[in-house]
């Protein structure tokens, strides 16, 4: 388990682009993390003022940050910078709204050198909001 201060020590992202609030579980190949979505998120000012919905690309970014935590927790990658290298088969199935808690689960399915591949799923109340495959490069 990691709190926000421990997450900030691992990820280079800072406000307003840090999209992981807590890590519940972390192993060599899997991470389960959470993002508490509030009406105070800066992106809700423009997406959309009368019907606030978390942008899908930011859900994918939150998944990428969770996956990066799993990779950067490995001894050989500590202190390195994670880069989002690609996405595939991403689907959005449920809107994420203010007040939702986004559960972010990423399983690292392959690691070749400094390139990692993960299966990612974001859920709200047990229902899939977004799923897909993500690719990381560690610099």
UniProtKB/Swiss-Prot annotation:
It catalyses: a (3R)-hydroxyacyl-[ACP] = a (2E)-enoyl-[ACP] + H2O. InterPro entries: FabA_FabZ, FabZ, HotDog_dom_sf. Keywords: Cytoplasm, Lipid A biosynthesis, Lipid biosynthesis, Lipid metabolism, Lyase. The active site is at residue 47. It is found in: Cytoplasm. GO terms for molecular function: (3R)-hydroxyacyl-[acyl-carrier-protein] dehydratase activity. GO terms for biological process: fatty acid biosynthetic process; lipid A biosynthetic process. Its main location: cytoplasm. It comes from the Bacteria. Disulfide bonds: none annotated. GO terms for cellular component: cytoplasm; membrane. Its EC number is 4.2.1.59. PANTHER family: 3-HYDROXYACYL-[ACYL-CARRIER-PROTEIN] DEHYDRATASE (PTHR30272:SF1). Involved in unsaturated fatty acids biosynthesis. Catalyzes the dehydration of short chain beta-hydroxyacyl-ACPs and long chain saturated and unsaturated beta-hydroxyacyl-ACPs. Belongs to the thioester dehydratase family. FabZ subfamily. This is 3-hydroxyacyl-[acyl-carrier-protein] dehydratase FabZ.
């Amino acid at each position: 388990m990691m709190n926000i201060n421990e997450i900030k020590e691992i990820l280079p992202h800072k406000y307003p682009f840090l999209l992981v609030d807590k890590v519940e579980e972390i192993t060599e190949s899997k991470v389960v993390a959470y993002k508490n979505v509030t009406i105070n998120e800066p992106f809700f000012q423009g997406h959309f003022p009368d019907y606030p919905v978390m942008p899908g690309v930011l859900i994918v970014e939150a998944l990428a940050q969770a996956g990066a935590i799993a990779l950067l927790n490995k001894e050989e990658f500590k202190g390195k910078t994670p880069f989002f290298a690609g996405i595939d088969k991403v689907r959005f199935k449920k809107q994420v709204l203010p007040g939702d808690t986004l559960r972010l689960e990423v399983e690292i399915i392959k690691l070749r050198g400094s390139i990692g591949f993960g299966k990612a799923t974001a859920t709200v109340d047990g229902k899939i909001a977004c799923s897909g495959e993500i690719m990381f490069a560690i610099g």
